[in-house]
């Protein structure tokens, strides 16, 4: 209903059986972006944990994935890039810089870790890349662990979209 009210001309609903990841992979060649609902673990609402089905999809596809939270939708007023300076995080920043999806929104590049000259340089490099693409960019470097620091940061940012790479550590 919201999509139609927003002017979307063509909607396609399908009922599918089988594994979510298999269905998403089937649609991937024709998709530019996937939007999935999230089921956060109630046991730790201050941490970022995704439902295992959503996590499997994110690991399997090569397209960007938006994970929608529960509750009232608010259009993003800014975006926060969770940035660790890795090659993958750098590719994420490059993808954002090329994408029209976030154009016009201010950015915050957030790094969680030790306050070192190398970390400051990595943040500056990410900021410069996004600024060259026309974004207004701030940076922040915070001590702690990303799983605790990022949710707290997002609460201070109002209606913000979190952009992050997938953590490649295998859950055991």
For the regions a language model picked out, list residue spans one by one.
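Short acidic/Ser/Thr-enriched loop-to-helix initiation segments
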Residues: 47-63, 69-133
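Glycine/small-residue-rich hydrophobic helix-like segments
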Residues: 105-170
């Amino acid at each position: 209903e919201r999509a139609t009210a927003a002017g979307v001309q063509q909607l396609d609903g399908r009922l599918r059986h089988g594994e979510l990841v298999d269905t998403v992979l089937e649609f991937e060649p024709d998709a530019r972006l996937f939007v999935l609902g999230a089921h956060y673990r109630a046991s730790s609402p201050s941490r970022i944990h995704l439902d295992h089905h959503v996590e499997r999809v994110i690991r399997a596809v090569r397209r960007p994935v938006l994970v929608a939270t529960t509750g009232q939708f608010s259009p993003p007023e800014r975006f926060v890039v969770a940035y660790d300076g890795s090659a993958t995080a750098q590719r994420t920043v490059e993808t954002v810089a090329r994408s029209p999806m976030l154009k016009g929104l201010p950015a915050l590049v957030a790094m969680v870790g030790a306050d070192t000259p190398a970390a400051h340089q990595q943040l500056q490099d990410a900021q410069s890349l996004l600024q060259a693409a026309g974004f207004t960019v701030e940076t922040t470097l915070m001590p702690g662990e990303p799983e605790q620091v990022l949710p707290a940061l997002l609460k201070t940012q109002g209606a913000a979209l979190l952009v992050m790479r997938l953590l490649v550590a295998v859950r055991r």
